Amino acid sequence: MIEGRISQLDLENRSAVIVEENGNRIQVNFALRTNVEVIEHETVGLMGGELEDLEEGYHVEVEVASTNEDGSIMCDSIACVS
């Protein structure tokens, strides 16, 4: 699992850059089947969402499906935790 903040989000290309607490930047690609969960503000619980619900600056947890040859990762699921 990768934890960090979304520093760049490219919805058109289904990708993002996640910055970990140590400053490490990770390129993340989202498959069509990627599970997205976002905070539901009334209950402060997680609910199903879409890639378009994510925003730069959100703190997220990313489940890695695979690592590409260029070092980027393919995301299995992403959950917004802030």
Where do the PLM segments sit?
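Short, flexible, surface-exposed loop segments at domain boundaries
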Residues: M1-Q27, I39-S82
